């Protein structure tokens, strides 16, 4: 049995990373390992968070130990958390990396944790080069990557981005697993009835947070082309705006 600690967002934080991390912790536990999660007491300051809320309204997952400790903007917290993590004597730390802004906090925590000369650190890199560039991206990313022993990516693009920064450490590309924790699978017919959608209509689904880099504006432009309009295809947008809605609404009105 190994002792595994997963570092990244977890309940009460919401989003895909939290869902993934919690399911991964359960998978380790199901295999007989001791698993827990180390999450954030402060992930993003409110003034830089573009959505409505960082927190989930869902109940906490059962049978998962979640330590809510990391303050992403407090260096004193990084040292305390790193010292705590070092004392846990984990066999394996799995850390998520998705944004250079997290590099200083996570890199410092991991450097202190690995001083126990026991713990191995594997990074699951969701992004290495961010979708939206900011000052400090490259040094923050380098600082973080140097604290890891090996890497997992879930796309060829992220793997190639990783190799721009880290050319020699072991890295493996795997497919993003399918989630199995959202209830029973519905057939297309059942799902359409539940959502009130016509059974035989052709539908394109845009699903998820709405941010500029995701290209919803380009999809709207494409849907307005006569060659598309004449097909009778319908666009269904299901997501939360992470930026001003006005521009998108103007496109719809046109």
Residue positions per predicted region:
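Nucleotide-sugar donor phosphate/pyrophosphate-binding loop at the beta->alpha transition
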Residues: 117-122, 128-147, 156, 160, ...
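Donor nucleotide-sugar binding/catalytic pocket of nucleotide-sugar-dependent glycosyltransferases
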Residues: 146-186
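Conserved donor-binding/catalytic core segment of Leloir-type glycosyltransferases
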Residues: 198-214, 220-223, 236
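Short N-terminal targeting/anchoring amphipathic segment
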Residues: 66-71, 80-104, 119-120
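N-terminal subdomain of nucleotide-sugar transferases
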Residues: 1-45, 49, 59, 88, ...
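Short donor-sugar binding/catalytic loops of nucleotide-sugar-dependent glycosyltransferases
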Residues: 10-12, 207-211, 226, 240-242
């Amino acid at each position: 049995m190994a002792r595994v600690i997963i570092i990244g967002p977890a309940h009460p934080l919401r989003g895909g990373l939290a869902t993934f991390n919690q399911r991964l912790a359960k998978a380790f536990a199901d295999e007989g390992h001791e698993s827990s999660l180390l999450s954030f007491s402060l992930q993003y300051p409110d003034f830089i968070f573009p959505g409505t809320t960082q927190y989930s309204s869902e109940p906490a997952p059962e049978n998962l130990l979640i330590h809510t400790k990391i303050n992403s903007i407090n260096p004193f917290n990084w040292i305390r958390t790193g010292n705590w993590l070092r004392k846990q004597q984990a066999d394996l730390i799995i850390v998520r990396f998705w944004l250079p802004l997290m590099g200083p906090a996570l890199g410092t925590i991991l450097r202190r944790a690995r001083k126990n000369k026991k713990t191995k650190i594997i990074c699951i890199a969701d992004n290495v080069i961010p979708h939206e560039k900011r000052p400090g991206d490259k040094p923050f990313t380098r600082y973080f990557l140097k604290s890891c022993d090996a890497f997992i990516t879930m796309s060829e693009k992220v793997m190639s981005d990783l190799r721009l920064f880290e050319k020699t450490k072991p890295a493996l590309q795997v497919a993003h697993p399918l989630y199995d924790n959202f209830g029973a699978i519905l057939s297309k017919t059942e799902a359409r009835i539940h959502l009130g959608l016509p059974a035989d209509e052709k539908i394109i689904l845009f699903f998820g947070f709405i941010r500029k880099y995701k290209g919803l504006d380009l999809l709207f432009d494409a849907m307005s082309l006569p060659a598309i309009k004449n097909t009778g295809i319908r666009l269904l947008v299901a997501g939360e705006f992470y930026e001003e809605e006005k521009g998108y609404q103007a496109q719809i009105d046109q």
